[in-house]
Amino acid sequence: MIRYTVAGHSRRCVVGASKRVGAIKCITVAATKRFISNKPNEVFTKLTNDNDPKRDAFFKYTWGSWLKNDKQEKEKRFTKFSIEGLNRILNDIYIQSNEMAKAPDGKILPPVFNKNLTVSLVNNVVPKNIGKINPNEKVQVTTLSSIHEGKHHRIYKVDTNLNKAFILRIPYPLENENTLSYRIRSEVATMDFADLKLGIKVPKIFCYGVNSLNPVRQPFVLQEFIEGELLMKDWDPLIEDGSSNQKKYDNVIKQVSDFQSKLVSLKLNAFGSIYFNNDLKDGNEKEFVKEDIYDGETNPDLQNRWKIGPSVERCLWRHKSHLDFHKQMKPFLGPWPKKSPMDIIKNTGLLEAENAKTRIAMKEAGSSAELMYPRTLKEQITTYENLAKIAPDLFNVKTKAIPNMQELLSPRLFHPDLDPMNIIVNKEAQEAYLLDFEGACTKPFILQNSPQFIAYDGPKIYDLKEDITDFDKLSEAEKAQYQFMYKRTRNQHQWEKKLNDNNPKLITAVAPPVKLLRSPYIAAVERKTEEEYLLIDESLLQLKEVWDIFAQNDLVNQKKFPLNYSKEDIERHVEDLQKLHEKLISTPFAATQGWIPQDMFDQLLNSGSIVKQENGDYTVKQPEATK
């Protein structure tokens, strides 16, 4: 019998073992506070009955609620999978482990494509990683714990009767299986590359499936469980200088920077994303670069292990399931030759413009129920076509004005989630592991944006007393605002200082003119809402103001700014951008697209601050105006 727990609010869900074989005990806990639960209620169900509705609570999304379309958003994140199928896969990898024990020491074998439509990384499926099983013994899942419900996937801890734990990652079905397939295939191969070639500590991946036809009945990744604490526990971005926690602050910067240094340490031979070479047998060979992923490999086991294929950077795939993949998406996904780094920007713009055109056509044909205004989509087309048009001229790739330009343009591995929240320090050895590589790609360092945990685009203050006139005479509220700006500036400066220590040839990538030149592309990559195309326009207009200076200094390719903006265009942009800022300020939870952490949501609902409407949506009750 397997028992599992569904916790409320914090949603730490557990499935535990019992002596009654053949049944699952489902435990639903209503928590009053994150990680604090009341006494659970227990329900029993048979292990082999995957369709028992009693266990559905274990798979439901519980970490937050949405003000709009809450029911639909939660249904999109329902991650029901076959526990019995997971059990079979675990037994299969232990059988493979026994076979791997016969392989020569140090031999690195290629991934094995199994008959059940899963793929095993047999190099990792060895006794030292998963333990041993006695002859005729079967592996049995004894406990399932839902330990994290993230933006893109659900994380389950899997305990077995061998006292060995695993992690099962199930992506939310927010996109079609083709998108998930590319993403999983590339992420697994990239983690394998980071482990075997770059020497980065990552969880060992044992098995994965890219669609729902495997025994788990969901796309999944089965990997090593690492017990420890997230590095984020030690990160305080608003720490006072000289605080007793200064060493922790410095260590976080160092640990994340060291990961970045290893990620960019090897120059690659193309732009795109990393896949296993033997993915070629099931795909179109034209998708992959034929030449070696990098030069100079002497280990025969690593030669031809990986290839560069289409980029899985999230911005290229986000909200594009309605496009014809082969005709409308594939031409813009790469891979791109290393001689054409700016094609990444150009194709990003062209793909987004194609996406907006298709959405308009679908809306006009009556085949789309989305509520997006046609004007917004038309403005997006103009913006993204402008981005594509300016792409070849954004950087003069032959300039001598930017030191080490060719180093900055070389393909290097980019991790989009380089963050203390994505790093765990294991309990025993106190070693840091980089966890999630979803969306990783190869692109020039000059186009790689700073990690979000230290990114800051506001006014820079390096010294409160010197930079702020009469700082000591300001009100406490004014001082707090400037102190916030100073600390954000300091964090970014410390990150860039560590970059210079680790990779001095790449430091000019954070020079203000270079940041400004790549800012339209970064705004496109980081866009979260429909209206944020305006931030791309804003970056382009800022470039327009300084283009002549950049041209005089040989930073850009064209002497004249490549885009035309009329006075009316600029006035309309200023008005629309102001409306966007007002919307962000006046609309509760706009920054999270209406999502609210569940404990906060329940408190607001119980207090009457949030009111449920007849259609199932919620509104935030505005405070009454004082007379």
UniProtKB/Swiss-Prot annotation:
Chief place where the protein resides: mitochondrion
Keyword Protease attached: no
A GO term from the CC aspect: mitochondrion
Localization terms from the record: Mitochondrion
Targeting signal (transit peptide) range: 1-43
Keywords, alphabetical: Mitochondrion, Transit peptide
KW Zinc-finger (keyword) present: no
Domain of life: Eukaryota
Family affiliation: Belongs to the AIM9 family.
PANTHER family on file: ALTERED INHERITANCE OF MITOCHONDRIA PROTEIN 9, MITOCHONDRIAL
Protein name: Altered inheritance of mitochondria protein 9, mitochondrial
Taxonomic lineage: Eukaryota, Fungi, Dikarya, Ascomycota, Saccharomycotina
